[in-house]
UniProtKB/Swiss-Prot annotation:
Keywords: Coiled coil, Membrane, Mitochondrion, Mitochondrion inner membrane, Transit peptide, Transmembrane, Transmembrane helix. One of its GO terms (biological process) is inner mitochondrial membrane organization. This is Sensitive to high expression protein 9 homolog, mitochondrial. It is a multi-pass membrane protein.
Amino acid sequence: MNVSTYNIRPIYRSHRLIRSRSCFCILNPLAVRFYSSKNFSSSNNPIANSNEKSSHHDEKLREIIETTNFGSELRKKKEMHDKKLHEQKAYEKYEKEAEGKETPQEKGQEEDSVSNSDKSTPEEEVKANDGSIIASEISEDIQREIGNLPSQKETRRYQLSKKLEEYLDSLQDTIFTATRALNDVTGYSSIEQLKKSINDLEVQLKNEKDNVKKCKDLYSQAILRRSLSQREINELLTRKHNWSPDDLERFTTLYRNDHVNEQEESNTHNALNDAESKVDAIQLKLTQSILTRYHEEQIWSDKIRRASTWGTWILMGINLFLFILATFLVEPWKRKRLVGSFEDKVKQAIFEMSEVQEGKWDQMILQQKESAAQQSVSTLKSWWFNSDDDSEPNKSSVYPMILTPVDNSWQGLKTTIRSHYNALRSSTISTLQFEKYEFAWFATTITILGCALGSILTVYFK
């Protein structure tokens, strides 16, 4: 599959998207590479000949891209790249001219090559790079604008699974390290080594038993060969007087091989004995290792059981201590603190309420006193001014007795005494009204005067 046939369907799809959405360009990276490729030959590809009509779409696509922000940025990058290339070529040319090794023909060739390279290679590279950059940036912009695309979900899922896998691996390593440290502390690592040595001994015992079987087979074969040789020798000896030259040669061979068979039988017997002794030694060692393992495991289990028992007792003691502490110290302290805070809040509320009520009561008492004082003053004035005309006070059945003078002067005191005297003489007043403070003061004064008068009379008439 060549480049043109591979990229023609994405190009057609990109053209349709561009023509349908003039303000929203979607480019396929393969299509961009197709546009920027200069090696594509339309004469060798019939599909390319059918696409020559869409050349104006390429120009339109390029114009749309260049009018966007991506196109302006790419133009700046392209200008910077071309400027660097020209500066590098000029610097190299200046160095060659300074060295004086350049001929006019070489200069012409170099200028032609520089111009051709400036026209072909940099432009192709820049266009290819521009196309790939534009495609990647537009693809990222599309993904950011739309969001929740299948590729984004797959990428997030892959990252999440990778993180989860790394976390599980680290957790497994941590658990393995903690288990190994716990085994080292409790002494179970040596038991594990003992179990491993027992497994090795079992494998070794199996191999040695196989070796014993092989040695037994070899020993039985050696015995069989020697017995057959001796039987044949005995048969030849029974007909010794009828031997032929072949029988004589056969007897000589058998007699010569009998010593070899005897040596082979002895060697196989010794090998069998050695193998059996090895099996017995390994079996004994294996049995002893198993007993040691069971003994060590019993000791380890007893130690763990003892530690677990002590741990249980310690936990029970801690729980009992915490229960006692919570029951006899923490709970009373919390209850006391709660009650104290509640009492403080109640006291504060009562104090605030009492202050409010006292303020109201003081205000009410002050108002009553002011009203009573004003009423008494008005009554006293009316009685005083009406006393010269021998007129009675304002007809009222209740008279407020105020012992304090109206003003702190002798005239005020005389006015108060005279008003009280007129009230006592009045026939319309049937009730004298005292305030609590005034009555207490009046009763105290009368009591003191009575006691003083009684004492004087007692002393005088004694």
